[in-house]
Amino acid sequence: MSTETELQVAVKTSAKKDSRKKGQDRSEATLIKRFKGEGVRYKAKLIGIDEVSAARGDKLCQDSMMKLKGVVAGARSKGEHKQKIFLTISFGGIKIFDEKTGALQHHHAVHEISYIAKDITDHRAFGYVCGKEGNHRFVAIKTAQAAEPVILDLRDLFQLIYELKQREELEKKAQKDKQCEQAVYQTILEEDVEDPVYQYIVFEAGHEPIRDPETEENIYQVPTSQKKEGVYDVPKSQPVSNGYSFEDFEERFAAATPNRNLPTDFDEIFEATKAVTQLELFGDMSTPPDITSPPTPATPGDAFIPSSSQTLPASADVFSSVPFGTAAVPSGYVAMGAVLPSFWGQQPLVQQQMVMGAQPPVAQVMPGAQPIAWGQPGLFPATQQPWPTVAGQFPPAAFMPTQTVMPLPAAMFQGPLTPLATVPGTSDSTRSSPQTDKPRQKMGKETFKDFQMAQPPPVPSRKPDQPSLTCTSEAFSSYFNKVGVAQDTDDCDDFDISQLNLTPVTSTTPSTNSPPTPAPRQSSPSKSSASHASDPTTDDIFEEGFESPSKSEEQEAPDGSQASSNSDPFGEPSGEPSGDNISPQAGS
């Protein structure tokens, strides 16, 4: 008997522990399962229902509870007992059923219950306030056991419903926001489907963009799956327009010059290419039309592609392929090279070099020889002598009078950067023969038949007997009356005839866009006579054009007198220099 009693006590103890464990498990999933369907069922007795004035209040509930208990005590004296019920707690609320009949007596939804109160005098009694605004009632119930589990279940039910409602509202709000975002994105896609910036916003960075694959350059390019450096790509430049890429040019350049320093060469090529492309900005500054030189390239990349008529060996210099080759230039002509764009900004520095005797690099080309690159010393380097007059004294407007009829082109007044083509000198017998004078006179007449000289600027004179000239119709005749007359060395005469680089068909179109450049003489006292004697045709043409009938007598004179007469821009008609007109070179 004792063993059976011990077994029964052990079973009851384990059942209580299980119920406690079940009561302690109050997770969300467990509570949902607990209150789902019919919910939790409790046995109880209905104390009564009382109307109250407020929806909540502890004192209010206590007063209502004492009032209902007094009513029950009066009924008990009459032999009436409390009604036995069972109540269920679920998501539907609190339902009160009659224990005998099982009929539903009262049903209060969760949202109708506003307050729950526990009786402080009886641990088995509790009550709650339910109803709508203006119709609140207090329901008092006495449970068969302690009322605390029922109160805890009601609290858990309210908390669970509140959390579920809150989560549902958040989900609805998130879904609404998502729908709004989708609507906005849909509007963007419909209106700005071609804009790659909006495409990058809508799609991820690694996705393929919606754009035309034909277009190679876009200001904004969405990165593809293979290229993820950034959203915006810099437009790619295409310097070569004739089918040759920059890689092809680099390979050709490396093959042609294997022993040169590539970074330095590329800088030099870039500067030379700018000089080639800048020629079109300053008017007609290219070579004369009769010289068959390649045209100026349209793009920088075309300058380094050799043409069919100009093939040079691989050992040639870097700039031999640039269209400055003088292989097609006839002997006896002075080649007019391209003026670098940086020369215009360095005019004061060049004038300083002219006065101080500095020697700018001049490329001299011999007949049949390879062209020499810019910046290298010439085959016959010549020192520079100080120019007796100050170059660039008059503004550019002084060379353009009001009535200008086909003046000399400004490109003919080349500065110190003009390369000179030296030709072999002729013998004394050839120069003094009358057979050579006739072709020269004919050539001089044909040369100057198309020229109309412009009126020169006013030349200030220091002599008191000569008045200041003005740009009138008499200035032209007064200017040429000075030919053969000794002038002061300080007179500024920019129309130095010996510096004019002329060809038989030189264009006479005025180059008004190119600024005036100083043209200092680039020969030493020892070299000047040789340089003038090596090119007698040019000097004879000019002097015979200005009424010098006895050139044969000048050519028969010794070399010293010839150097003195040639150094004077406007020689004496008889070929005999005056005392005032002797050049500093001859004097020294």
Swiss-Prot record:
Subcellular location: Cytoplasm
Biased composition (Polar residues): 424-436
Xref: SMART domains: PTB
PID domain: residues covered: 36-189
Residue list for modification Phosphoserine: 524
Pfam families in the record: DAB2_SBM, PID
UniProt cross-references to Gene3D superfamilies, sorted A to Z: Pleckstrin-homology domain (PH domain)/Phosphotyrosine-binding domain (PTB) (2.30.29.30)
Top-rank taxon: Eukaryota
Tissue and organ expression note: Mainly expressed in brain.
Entry GO CC: cytoplasm; cytosol; glutamatergic synapse; intracellular membrane-bounded organelle; perinuclear region of cytoplasm
Residue ranges, compositional bias (Basic and acidic residues): 15-26
Residue numbers of Phosphotyrosine PTMs: 198, 220, 232
Sorted UniProt keywords: Cytoplasm, Developmental protein, Differentiation, Neurodegeneration, Neurogenesis, Phosphoprotein, Spinocerebellar ataxia, Ubl conjugation
Region: Disordered, residue numbers: 1-26, 417-443, 451-470, 502-588
Maturation and modification: Phosphorylated by FYN on Tyr-198 and Tyr-220 upon reelin induction in embryonic neurons. Also phosphorylated on Ser-524 independently of reelin signaling.
Molecular function GO terms recorded: signaling adaptor activity
Biased composition (Acidic residues): 537-546
Family matches, as InterPro entries: DAB1/2_SBM, Dab_PTB, PH-like_dom_sf, PTB/PI_dom
Aminoacyl-tRNA synthetase in keyword set: no
SUPFAM superfamilies per the UniProt record, alphabetical: PH domain-like
Domain notes: The PID domain specifically binds to the Asn-Pro-Xaa-Tyr(P) motif found in many tyrosine-phosphorylated proteins.
Subunit composition and interactions: Associates with the SH2 domains of SRC, FYN and ABL. Interacts (phosphorylated on tyrosine residues) with CRK and CRKL (via respective SH2 domain). Interacts with SIAH1, LRP8 and VLDLR. Interacts with LRP1. Interacts with APLP1 (via NPXY motif). Interacts with DAB2IP. Interacts with ZSWIM8.
Alphabetical list of PANTHER family matching this protein: DISABLED HOMOLOG 1, PID DOMAIN-CONTAINING PROTEIN
Function: Signaling adapter of the reelin-mediated signaling pathway, which regulates the migration and differentiation of postmitotic neurons during brain development. Mediates intracellular transduction of Reelin signaling following reelin (RELN)-binding to its receptor: acts by docking proteins through its phosphotyrosine residues and PID domain.
Reported disease: Spinocerebellar ataxia 37: A form of spinocerebellar ataxia, a clinically and genetically heterogeneous group of cerebellar disorders. Patients show progressive incoordination of gait and often poor coordination of hands, speech and eye movements, due to degeneration of the cerebellum with variable involvement of the brainstem and spinal cord. SCA37 is an autosomal dominant form characterized by adult-onset of slowly progressive gait instability, frequent falls, and dysarthria associated with cerebellar atrophy on brain imaging.
Protein name as it appears in the record: Disabled homolog 1
Gene encoding the protein: DAB1
